[in-house]
Amino acid sequence: MNTKTALSGLLAIQLIIIAGLWWYAQNQSNSNRSQALLDIHWENVDKVTITSETGTVSLGLGQSKNSGEWQLLGDGLLAQSDKVNDLLEKFEQLKVTWPVATNQTSHSRFEVDQENAQRRIAIHSGENLLGEILIGSSPGLKQRHIRKGGSDQVYVVELELADIPPKTTDWLDRSLLAANNVDRIEGADFVLVKSGESWQLSHKSPSILKNQADPVAKNQQEIENLLSSLKKLRVTGLVKDKPDLAEGHAVKLDVTSGDNSWRYTFQENNGQHFVQRNDRDTLFTFAKSDYEKIAQSSQLIVASQEEQKVEDKEE
């Protein structure tokens, strides 16, 4: 009888141990199961703000959300939509498991508090804040401490600050002034018009075309260079405090593409190079090499009457 009782007790203890181990394993499995950092409806996101020590960048979808075009809010300028969408996709795919800290006192140490976070990301749908992400210090290569707004839990995730630049110009669509499918260009001394697949070139008094006998063929390289420069035009930054450009040299071109017509003003002043288009109030900087290509191409197409007379005499 005592033996049976002892065996029964031992069996009960074993069952308790097995149940405990099973419960512990299940609890560990649930704890290690990854879950999304932000459980929100990402398809409704239409505004993102990125705040750092350098300021705040606000990005929003245009009036037509279906267009998918992101803009720099406040400036009304096109942003790099692919870059914004890639960032949102990274945030959507952020998965977390076991936190490295769970109390508020750890936030400043990991730089995920409101004051010291290296990036604060606010994600909106209309006026509603869907979620906030605070990104802090790096515990290792391509890793960041991260915290969801409103939560004390701190996690480590794979994320790089290089994917979340803090400046407006980092998100600006640098090709926003590029002119594609151009069919007419008018400069100070010439008019270039596309007719079918060919171009017609004429001069404006008092200048005359170089190689006037066959102007398009003789100026083909300059024409192609000018068209290419307009198509590949890239800005490098925004000018908040506009300088006095009255003393600088300016190249003005009236450009037509289908139903769109623009006046470009390219200027050089004190070693800096600026471009502005008449459909925008913003003054942009752009590369010296691009300025020189446009200025040179537009000047090479024509020559003054005196220059042409000299060339004729030499011939």
Predicted segments, located by residue:
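Secondary-structure "cap/kink" motif recognition
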Residues: 1-315
